[in-house]
Amino acid sequence: KQGYFTVQDESSMCAVAAAGIRPEDFVMDICAAPGGKTTAAAEFAQQGHVLSMDIAEEKLELIEENVEWLKLANVDIRCQDATEYMQEQEKKADVVIADLPCSGLGIMGRKNDIKYRVTEEQIESLVELQHTILQNACRYVKAGGTLLYSTCTITKEENTLQVERFLKEHPEYTLKEQRQFLQGINACDGFYYAVLHKLGD
C-alpha cells in the first residue's frame, strides 16, 4: 500500500531485466499499459528517463496510478499510436520496449475465454500489426542500443517467426537472447521475449 514494491509475473520481469537497462538510460515503452514494464524499467533507469506510451487514453490512467503509487519521478506518460512514426524520437533511445498487441494465448489460465475467441484470421492480422509497429520501434533505438520485443502468447507466427522476419529485414540488428515461457512447464504466464541489439554506426 505504501509503494515500496509491486507484484508482477516472473516472465515480464525477466524480459525487462534481460534488456540490460542501465541507470542513466533513456527508455521508450511504446505499448505500455497497464505499466508493469514501464515501472520496472524506471527502477533500473533511476538516473535516466522512461517515456511511457499507449494508444488508449483510458489505459494511461492505469500507468499514472502505478507510477504515482511507486513514487517514480523519472517517467513521462503520453497518448500515442505506436503505428504512427515519431520522427523526433529517431535514434534517441538506449532501450525500446515493444510489448505488442497479441493473441494472448499465454494467459489462458487467467482468461479462459481467449481460446474460444481467437481465430487464425485474427492472429494473421496481429502478426501484420506487430510487424508495422516493429518497423517504427527499431528506428527509435540509437546505435549500440537494445530493442526488447515481447508478447504474452505462444504462437510461432507472433514470436520466433516474427523475429526471424525482422532480422532478415534489418541486418543492423542481431539477436542477443530469446526465451519462450509456457504455462504448465514454467511457473508463470505463457510469454515470449527477444532481446535485439542494434549494431554501432
Each model region followed by its residue ranges:
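S-adenosylmethionine
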Residues: 1-201
